[in-house]
Amino acid sequence: MADLFDEFIEPGVKNEIMDVEEAPENPMEKLDSAKKRQAREDMTNLLANMHNDVGVGNFDEATSKRARVEEEEEVEEARMENIIVHTIRTDNENCTHEVAIPPNAEFAELRENSGTEPAKYYPFQLDAFQKQAILCIDNNQSVLVSAHTSAGKTVVATYAIAKCLREKQRVIYTSPIKALSNQKYRELEEEFKDVGLMTGDVTLNPDASCLVMTTEILRSMLYRGSEIMKEVGWVVYDEIHYMRDKERGVVWEETIILMSKNIKQAFLSATIPNARQFAQWVASIKQQPVNVVYTDYRPTPLQHWIYPVGGEGMYEVVNVKGEFREDKFRDAMSGLATAGDSAGSFNKRRTGGGTQGDSNVLKIIRSVASNDGLNCIVFSFSRKECESYAISLKDMDFNKDHEKGMVKSVYESAIAQLSPEDQKLPQILNILPLLRRGIGVHHSGLMPILKETIEILFGEGLVKVLFATETFSMGLNMPARTVVFTSARKFDGSDNRYITSGEYIQMAGRAGRRGKDDRGTVILMVDSAMSADDAKQIIKGATDPLNSQFRLTYNMVLNLMRVEGMAVSWIINNSFHQFQSYAKIPEIDKKCVQVERKIASFNFPWENEMRTLVDLQDQLEATRQRIIQIQREPKYIVGFLHAGRLFKVKSGDRDFKWGILNQFKKEQNPDDRNDQIYLCDMMIAINTEGRFDPTNPATLVPGFDLPKRRWIRVPMTIDRITAISAVRLKVPADIDKPDGQMRLDGMMAAATKRFGNQIPLLDPIQDMEIKTVEMKELIAREKSLEGRLETHSMTKRDNMKDLKKQFEQKQDAVKELNALKAERKSVQSTLHLEELNNRKRVLRRLGYLGNDDALVLKGSVACELSASDELILTEMLLKGIFNTLDVAQTAALLSCFVFQDKCAAPKLATELQTCLSELHEQARNVAKVSNECKMEVMEDKYVSSFNPGLMDVVYQWVNGATFSEIVKTTDVFEGSIIRTLRRLEEVLREMINAAKALANKELEQKFEDARKNLKRDIVFAASLYL
C-alpha cells in the first residue's frame, strides 16, 4: 500500500480599579433654584401616583437605605407568595378566566351589567373570551387578554375606549411602533371621532379624550407627571408581548410600574404560556385584582405543509385538528435532495434568493395560485431576498385589468403629496409594475410611503402575493389565506438557528381570514434534513414566554432622582424581572436538597490524590489547546494546507477523528470587512444511519470508528482543526462513488496500521518553524506535564478509570450545588442594586450628581435626552463641541447616535472626521470612567457603536441636497435612510430642550435650524393613515 500515500515531514518551512465616591469640583454643580423648583413640580404628580407604593421616602443615611432594601426584599418575597389566583368558570372550554388577587383585596364575583346599557354594541356574536374580558372592564378590573393573532382582541380595546368616553374619562391606547399607532389612530378616529395621536413625529388633536401614542411618549408623560394622567381611566397596551424585546421591552415595564394605581389597564397579547405570572406581577405592584382571559382557540384553523427543496410536491404534516402526522413528515424528508446531490457544493455558497431558491418559491406560488390560495404572504428573513423573489415572478400576473387600474389609482393618490422629483425616485418607479401585477414587497428598507401604500393595497386584496420580512407580522392587521416561509432558519446576528415556535406562530398566525376562509394554509420550505422533534418544536411548540428585559439606564436613574425622597431601588424592586426571579426560589431549594443528598452518597478516600491528577490533566489539555491555536494561525498553517493531508477535526463536542483535506480557499469574513477566513473542503467519515446534510454540521454524526461509514465533503473553517498530521494521502478522484469510498477506507487502514494508531503530527518548532518564545515555553511545559503524569501514583491503579469517573461525578455535583446556592443568593438579593450603585458612581465622577446624590444642572440636562446616549450627548454639550460646528455638521455628527445599519465605511471630509474624532474621544473617556467605577464597558465596541455610515448623507441633506442625490452616494436602503433621518429629528428635538435647560439660546437655535432643514420632502411625507 506504500504507493497509495506519500508520508513525509515537511521541512522548515493590570489596570487598577478605582472605587471613587467623590465627585470632582464643578462650577455647574449648583442647580439654579428656579430650575430645581421646576424639576420638583414636574415630578409632583408622579409622586402622587406612587402614593403608598414601596420605595417612596426620604432616606438620607446609607444605613437606612440598606435597611430599607432588606425590608423590601422580605416584603417582595412575602408579597409574591400571597398573590392568590382564582379560576372563574366560563361556559366555553376554549376560554379560561383567572384572576390574581393581592393580599389586601378580597375575591368578589364579577357582576353582569344589569340595568345599565353596555358601553358599546357589536354587530356580530362575541366569542367567549371577548365576553369575559368585557365583563372585567364593566367591573372596573384590569385584564390581560391572551389570544391568537386575528382572534378579535381589538373588540376588548374598543369597549374600554367606549366605556371611558361614556364616563367622561380619558383613555390612552399605546402600541410598540409608530406605524401601528398611525394605523390604530385611523381606525379609532373613524369610529369614535374624539381621538388624538402622539408619536413624536406627529401630534394630532392632543386634547382628545382618546389618545393613541407610542409607549415612549407614555413613559415620558409619566416621568414628567403630566396633567393628562389625572384624567385617564384606562390604558390599553396593544401587543404587550413586545415587552420581551431586548432593546425596548424595558420601556413597557417602566410605564406599567410608574402607572397610577387608580388607572385600570387592559393588556392585549398574543398567546403567552406565563400569562398568569404576568397578571400576578401587576396585581402585586398595583395592589388590585388583575384578570387573565386566555384562549388558544383559532377561529380559522391552520393546516401546515412542508415543501422539501429539491423534491416534488408538498406534505401536510399538521392537519386542521392540530395532529402531527409522522408518516407525512418522513415522506417530506425523503423528498429532500439527497446528501450526495449536495456534495461538491463547496464553491457554491448557499445564499438565499439565488436561482435555486427563486425556482422553488416560483413552484410554490404557482401551486398556491392554482389551488385558490391567494392572497399569500411569503416571509423571508432577508430584505434582499424579498426583492429577489418578487423579481423572479416576472412572468406571473395575478390582477385583472380593472384591478390594475385600481392599483394605479391608489398608487398615484399616495405619491401625489411628493414633489415631482421625488416621484421619479427609482424605488418609487420600480415598484409600480410589480404592484400592477398583484405582487408586493414589504421590509424596513422600503420608504414608509411605499410600505403604507402596499399595506393598503394588500388590505384591499389588490396585492395577491406579498414578500415580507418578519416585522410585517407584528401588529398590523393584515391576514392572508396562505403564509409561506422560505426557510426554517434565520440568522439572529450571531447564529443561523431554527426559528422559535413563538416566531413561527406569530407569522403563521396571519394565515386564515376570519369570516372568509374555512382554514388557513401555512407552507414551510425546508432545504436540509431536520428531525421530527425539531419540526414539532417549531410548528406545534409552545409560544415564547413573556420574560422581563428590564435593565437600568442612566436616563431612568436620573429621572427617578429628580425629586428628593425618590428611592431608585423602588423601580428595581417592582420590576417584572425581580418578580420572576423570586418565583424561582422554591425550585432552587428543591434542587439543592437533591444535590446535597447525591454528594453525601459518595465514599471516595483518594479524593486529594485524584484532584492533583485531574489538575495536571487539565493543565496539559489547556497547554495543548494553546499550541494548536497558534498552529492554526494563517501565517503558520496556510503553507501546510495541502490536498490529502490528514487533520483531526471537531465540531462542537463531536469528534470526527481524522479528516482529509481536499482543497481550501480564502474568503472575506462576512462579519468583518477587514478580516478574511480560510474555508477548508474536508472529507470526514460520518454515520449514515440517519438523515444528514453536508452543509449543516448539526446533522452530522461521527463515524470514523464504525464499520459502516461514509466519507463526505464538508466545508469548515480552520478553527475546527485540533491536530495537524505529517501524513498526506493520494485522494481518489471518484471519492463520491462506492469504489472510491473503499479505496479511501483502505488508505486510512494502511496509514493507521503503519504508524500503530499513532499517526505522526507536525512538530510546531522543527516542522512549522514557529520559533517564538511562547511556543518554546509551551512545548517545554507540555513535556514536563507529561512526565509528571507518567509518575503520578493514581495512574498505576488498575481501577483508575472508575475512580476518576466517581471523582468527576462528585465534582460535578459540588459545582452544581455551588451554582444553585449562588443563583439563590442572587435571586434573594435586590437584582441590579450593585449596578445601580456603580451607575451612581459614574454619575458622580462625571458631575451629574453631587456628593449628596442630588441632581445638579448637568444631570437635569441629561434628563432631557432619552432617544440616544444621554451621557455622551451631555458631555459634548457641556464641553462646547457643538459650539464650533455649523448646522449641517451638527446634524451629521448626531446621526452617529441613531444610524444602525451596516454599510461601507464612508470617506469623510476633514471637518466631519475631526468632529467624529471628538465624539470618539468623549466615548473613550466615558468608557474609562465607567470601568473605573466597575461598570464594565468594552471600550472599542462602545466607541464603534457610534456609526458614521450616514454622516456625509445627512450633511448633504441638511445642506439642501435632494433625496435622489443622496441615495446615489450610499448603498444603504432608502427606507433605512429615512428611518435614520426621522430618528435624528427626535434627537434634535431633545437637544433643543437640553439647550433650553442650559439657557444657551445660540445652541437652541442651531439645533432648531438643523431640525427645520431636516424636515422636508419625502423624508417627512405624511402617513397615508393620517
From Swiss-Prot:
Species: Caenorhabditis elegans
GO molecular function, one term: hydrolase activity
Gene Ontology cellular-component terms listed: TRAMP complex
Residues annotated as domain Helicase ATP-binding: 134-290
Name used for this protein in its record: mRNA transport homolog 4
Gene: mtr-4
GO BP annotations, alphabetical order: maturation of 5.8S rRNA; RNA catabolic process
InterPro entries tied to this protein: DEAD/DEAH_box_helicase_dom, EF_Hand_1_Ca_BS, Helicase_ATP-bd, Helicase_C-like, MTR4-like_stalk, MTR4_beta-barrel, P-loop_NTPase, RNA-DNA_Helicase
Occurrences of domain Helicase C-terminal (ranges): 360-564
Main location: nucleus
Binding-site positions, ATP: A147, H148, T149, S150, A151, G152, K153, T154
Pfam families named in the record: DEAD, DSHCT, Helicase_C, MTR4-like_stalk, MTR4_beta-barrel
